[in-house]
Amino acid sequence: MAKLRFIVVGSGWRSLFYWRIAQALPERFALCAMLCRTEEKAEKMHREYGVPVSTSAEQCIALHPDLVVVAVNKASIAAVSTEWLARGFAVLCETPAALEEDALRALWQLHRQGAKLQVAEQYWLYPTLAKRLAAVRSGALGTPQFVRLSVAHGYHAVSLARQFLNAGQQPVRVTGRSWTEKIIETDSRWGAVHNGALVEKTLQQHTLEFAGGGTAFLDFNGVQYHSYLRSTHTSVQGERGEVFDDTLRCLDAAGEPVCRQLTPLPDPLAAAAAQAGLNEDETAIACFLDRMQGYLAGGAEVYPLADALQDAYLALLMERALAVPGQSVESTPQPWNTEER
């Protein structure tokens, strides 16, 4: 298989993930250029990281990339993605696809008109989460009824919850509440923090009740992404058993209770990524990029756009629920719920 050639639009923290992936797995990926807004930023990215850079969209177009990765600030993702789709390129945009319902619907309309758009929702490809999803999907728990997630925020959490519960595009009722939590900061995007600073962070809790009967309890504080004092947790329960983090408790074929530890799924690319020094988030994105090859060749979507838009839409409902604690916010039908995909 030929390597995937792509450009990245954006030069922030997230864009560097794609550069590290291309560096770690050069036989599969080639980052042709990073499109920066200013000469100063382009010079900085090239000087500090060795990234091939440009400030000209025309120069990037002339490179004839297979894919355009849009990794700009959240408020600009939808507009920038639309610009590159209009130029005739396939686009993989960072999450969320948009921050407003109208923009989500507009992206769906572009998809219906044939635009090649995917959203880089990667959490289901985390090796630790992939094995838990596989255990649930194996039927070992029976029908998943409850999922408790303290793994990620917003649309990422919604994506996982819907998959663990096999909830698809079901209508949902959302309630939410938030608290301020004091914690000593120990880590960050840029590395460990040792100054003992006591900071205030926001803990958010949401309940999502799906029309099909499954319920998700989402509990997350943004500090969990980078902290030595706060871990993450996953619990999924069905009538025949439970997955709690990496432990599966269930009944065997004879009806006897068994308990076993989940092991990583066989995935040569994930193994190669880890061996090359990529972290779990980068590994998941690398796996997503690799699957984009098939999509670009006319195959199935990597993560259906309808699901990515539903994730973003429900994340908006979660924000609204926080503004009315004790009250519920209900989803309404969206075009991607029912239209042919």
Go through each PLM region and give its residues:
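C-terminal helix-rich "cap/oligomerization" subdomain common to oxidoreductases
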Residues: 1-3, 59, 67-69, 115-116, ...
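Beta-strand-loop-alpha-helix segment that lines the small-molecule cofactor/substrate pocket
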Residues: 66-67, 73-74, 78-124
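Rossmann-like NAD(P)H-binding beta-loop-alpha module
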Residues: 127-146, 157
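Short, well-ordered coil/turn residues at beta-beta hairpins
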Residues: 71, 94, 210, 219-220, ...
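Short acidic low-complexity segments
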Residues: 52-63
